[in-house]
Regions:
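Non-catalytic interaction-recognition regions
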Residues: 1-93, 108-597
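A common structural junction motif
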Residues: 103-107
Length: 597
């Protein structure tokens, strides 16, 4: 289906051409004065300069040609030369029925040429718990992935774990100090290693920060960790077996935590998976003359003549031969081109890492790791801050674990749901359902609270505001969906058959209903724009507008008590469409709605 605004523009453009003016002046936009009209065209203002006449003479001519067009209720020429457009309610009702008949797509066409897109979530380091700093990459990445999938693309989400480098040597060294008799440290051992890990997730989460602290104050400990890292990367059997245990224990725990966030990955690869590609990649860069030595390090120059700021060389190997994040990211691209051959690779990472990605992307293009046809995108996100405007912390100033934050919001939502239950005596929700509902609504509060902000901007994480059932919040959106579900259930309880409602939506009978239809009609344009700009906040803004439009219609209209049966069916059919569009949108944002609240 064509976007409504495009259909309107086509009609207005035809009128401009018929009146003897260039088609470029027929572009229509949403009205910036919704109290006067629904759409507007300002083309006559620009055309007046070219055709050397008063703008209103042009707009008068065009309006006269559109007077009898069945698409419009009215097209008014307003001085000095604007066209104010109102949609015909019968045309709008047909557009609604066409959307409803287009099951699961609602007028949004799938991509004609599906792309293969890899989304790199810039995942956490293994052996460390997820903390609030991991929230944005997970939440934004999941939504970007779901939007692209809904558009019809083949999307592969990769957690991209930090499982390489000194941190692994630190863990091995600290474990050796704690449990020196483990068989993994016996170089002469040639047998099978135990299948059971010699540590639990809670032990592992204590080992890493302890080791990290020691390495900063104890030089001999740091030396031992560097040696362990080198031996691990050199293939020492016992250390390789320990790495396998670290990964298994960590990933099991990470999967549980990501599951609670409703975030899922097609690939659970780490930096270590790209390491086999490093030697060949480095050799290629040397042989082809891309890489050269500079101050002891191997680098690739990536500055360009058009640069307005200094872009340092991309370091491939440090002076001691060790690789860096840039090395790993480039080798990961080599691996992805070989295994997935993507048309686009999207990286989710803090906006402060933008220089790193400029260097890596330029190096990848210059050295031929990726062809010109593969798009490389960095979605740089802002910081999640507390009410004091500083990065979000625990009350004692520490970094808050993500599961503790989610638990805090779950508890807050559970209290609100129980309060709601007391106010509504007929709402009998047992403890188990109340807890599950609280989890569902809490997740919406967190995700919507994040995604409703433009990704690149910092935002204040305000639990009180995010968990409110009023205003631009996740719980408000869910409350609207639950309200619609309740009306539909009552309709069916009285013998109504929702599945039999086909082409039942009739022309709007009041302003609230027409406003709801106009909001629904923006669905395909909104999702297309959110995909093209990797901008989930556009979907949030849309569903907030849609929820407000529905609630306005609901308060203005007697739905279930409507005596005209055909009109009642029209209302119910419109509610079904509203519910389905809200549900498909929140699914793209990565959360769902309960049946009751």
């Amino acid at each position: 289906m064509k976007k409504l605004i495009n259909l309107i523009s086509e009609e207005v453009t035809k009128a401009f051409v018929s009146a003897g003016y260039d088609e470029k002046y027929g572009k229509v936009t949403l009205s910036n004065r919704p109290d006067l009209c629904e759409f507007q065209c300002n083309g006559a203002m620009a055309a007046a300069k070219e055709y050397k006449c008063a703008p209103f003479m042009i707009s008068d001519k065009v309006a006269a040609l559109l007077e009898s067009d069945e698409m419009f209720e009215s097209v008014e020429s307003v001085k000095p030369g604007f066209l104010n457009i109102k949609m015909d309610t019968a045309f709008l009702a047909k557009y609604m029925n066409d959307m409803k008949d287009d099951e699961g797509r609602y007028g949004l066409e799938k991509a004609k040429k599906p792309l293969t897109i890899v989304v790199d979530y810039g995942g956490p380091n293994v052996a460390k718990p997820l903390h609030v700093g991991h929230l944005r990459s997970a939440v934004i990445g999941e939504s970007v992935k779901r939007i692209a999938k809904f558009m019809g693309h083949n999307v592969i989400g990769d957690v991209h774990l930090g499982d390489w480098g000194l941190q692994m040597g630190l863990i091995i060294t600290e474990l050796r100090e704690r449990k020196p008799d483990l068989v993994y440290f016996d170089e002469s051992y040639t047998g099978e290693y135990p299948k059971e890990a010699p540590f639990t997730i809670s032990e592992l989460e204590d080992i890493y920060p302890t080791a990290s602290g020691k390495s900063k104050s104890d030089e001999s400990f740091k030396e031992a960790a560097l040696l362990a890292t080198k031996e691990l990367q050199g293939g020492r059997r016992g250390y390789q077996a320990l790495l396998s245990h670290i990964m298994n224990v960590s990933v099991t725990d990470l999967k549980r935590n990501y599951e609670n966030l409703n975030v899922h990955f097609e690939l659970w690869k780490g930096e270590s998976d790209a390491q086999p590609y490093v030697p060949g990649m480095v050799e290629m860069m040397k042989e082809k003359g891309f890489a050269h030595m500079s101050e002891g390090a191997l680098v690739v120059d990536v500055k360009e003549d058009t640069d307005t700021k200094e872009i340092p060389p991309c370091i491939i190997l440090k002076s001691d031969g060790a690789s860096l994040y840039s090395t790993t990211d480039l080798a990961t691209l080599v691996m992805r081109m070989k295994e997935n051959n993507p048309d686009r690779v999207i990286y989710l990472a803090d906006a402060r890492q933008s220089m790193h990605f400029i260097q890596v992307f330029r190096c990848a293009r210059k050295t031929g790791i990726v062809p010109d046809t593969t798009e490389l995108v960095h979605i740089g996100f802002g910081t999640m801050n507390g009410k004091d405007g500083k990065p979000f912390k625990t009350r004692d100033g520490g970094v808050m674990r993500l599961e503790y934050l989610l638990k805090e919001i779950d508890d807050e939502m559970l209290n609100k749901i129980k309060e709601n239950q007391k106010e509504k005596e007929n709402l009998n929700i047992d403890e188990a359902e109340a807890k599950q509902t609280a989890k569902t609504v809490a997740l919406a509060a967190v995700k919507y609270g994040d995604l409703s902000n433009q990704a690149s901007k910092d935002y204040i994480f305000d639990i009180d505001r995010f968990t409110s059932f009023e205003g631009n919040t996740g719980p408000y959106i869910l409350y609207t969906i639950v309200r619609i579900k309740s009306i539909l259930s009552k309709y069916e309880a009285k013998g109504g058959n929702i599945s039999a409602l086909k082409d039942a939506i009739m022309p709007a009978v009041n302003a609230g209903q027409k406003n709801l239809m106009l909001s629904l009609a923006k669905f395909n344009a909104t999702i297309e724009s959110a995909y093209e700009e990797s901008a989930p906040h556009k979907i949030c803004a849309y569903i907030y507008e849609l929820a407000n439009a529905f609630n306005g219609f609901y308060h203005d209209t007697k739905i279930l008590s409507e005596e005209n049966e055909e009109l009642k069916k029209s209302y119910i059919s419109l509610l079904v469409l509203t519910k389905e569009i809200l549900e498909v949108c929140i699914d793209m944002l990565g959360f769902s709605a309960p049946d009751r609240m």
